[in-house]
């Protein structure tokens, strides 16, 4: 009798565990299906853009809905690179990117080195003030910056997209570089001071070479933010004499009412290159 009583609870527990496993498996399957559906929904617009970029004009503007081209037209991408408007805009973008790829990591690590490895009066107060700028939405500073750049004569040029970045490119990069530099042993500075190295020499020969990981991170972020930036050129642009960037040229080609639908495949190809 006692063995039978022991067997029944064990059987119930086993049945409960099997049911729990089945419910858990069903839940996981449902979650995976849901995530796949969400992923497909998110990827579909980009896949459609790539598909449209490989179509002929007739396939795009035709009455019949076509999702994929009969014969991929890779020549559409060559037409983008042969278009003078896109080509000059691409050159302007590369100039902005190369300038900022050099200026932002150097200036951010240089400023961060002062906060992390040097001693001067009011350092913590100044650093806290700098961090407080991170709480300001970018739109709050647009009107003051517009007025300032107008006074300098920078509007309708690429200067607003480059020169301000020699101050670190934003408090977040300085904060990250400072945190990285603070993690380095202080003995390195002490040894350099004994050898007679000043702050500048310690930065260029010790701090900067050791900052390679954070520099790579900053450069990746600088590249992606500048490559896809059309908001900045949109603000500082006054007329058609502005040296358009590639992202703005693509944006303008989709919003300009004077551009016909017969070039939609070329514009889609430009959008793929920009993305």
What is the predicted function of each stretch?
Residues 1-36:
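Transmembrane alpha-helical segments of polytopic membrane transport and secretion proteins
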């Amino acid at each position: 009798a006692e063995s039978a009583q022991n067997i029944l609870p064990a059987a119930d527990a086993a049945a409960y565990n099997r049911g729990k496993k089945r419910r858990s498996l069903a839940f996981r399957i449902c979650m995976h299906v849901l995530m796949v559906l969400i992923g497909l929904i998110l990827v579909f617009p980009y896949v459609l853009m790539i598909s449209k970029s490989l179509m002929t004009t007739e396939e795009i503007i035709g009455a019949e809905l076509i999702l994929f081209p009969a014969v991929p037209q890779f020549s559409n991408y060559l037409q983008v690179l042969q278009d003078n408007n896109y080509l000059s805009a691409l050159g302007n973008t590369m100039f902005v990117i190369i300038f900022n790829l050099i200026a932002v990591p150097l200036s951010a690590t240089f400023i961060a080195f002062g906060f992390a490895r040097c001693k001067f009066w009011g350092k913590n107060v100044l650093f806290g003030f700098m961090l407080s700028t991170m709480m300001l939405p970018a739109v709050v500073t647009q009107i003051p910056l517009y007025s300032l750049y107008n006074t300098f004569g920078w509007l309708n040029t690429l200067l607003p997209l480059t020169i301000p970045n020699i101050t670190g490119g934003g408090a977040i990069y300085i904060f990250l570089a400072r945190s990285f530099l603070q993690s380095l042993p202080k003995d390195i500075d002490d040894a350099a001071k004994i050898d007679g190295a000043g702050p500048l020499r310690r930065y260029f020969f010790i701090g900067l070479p050791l900052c390679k990981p954070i520099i790579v991170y900053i450069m990746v972020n600088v590249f992606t933010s500048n490559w896809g930036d059309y908001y900045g050129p949109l603000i500082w642009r006054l007329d058609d004499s502005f040296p358009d960037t590639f992202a703005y040229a693509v944006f303008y080609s989709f919003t300009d009412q004077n551009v016909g639908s017969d070039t939609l495949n070329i514009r889609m190809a430009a959008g793929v290159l920009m993305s």
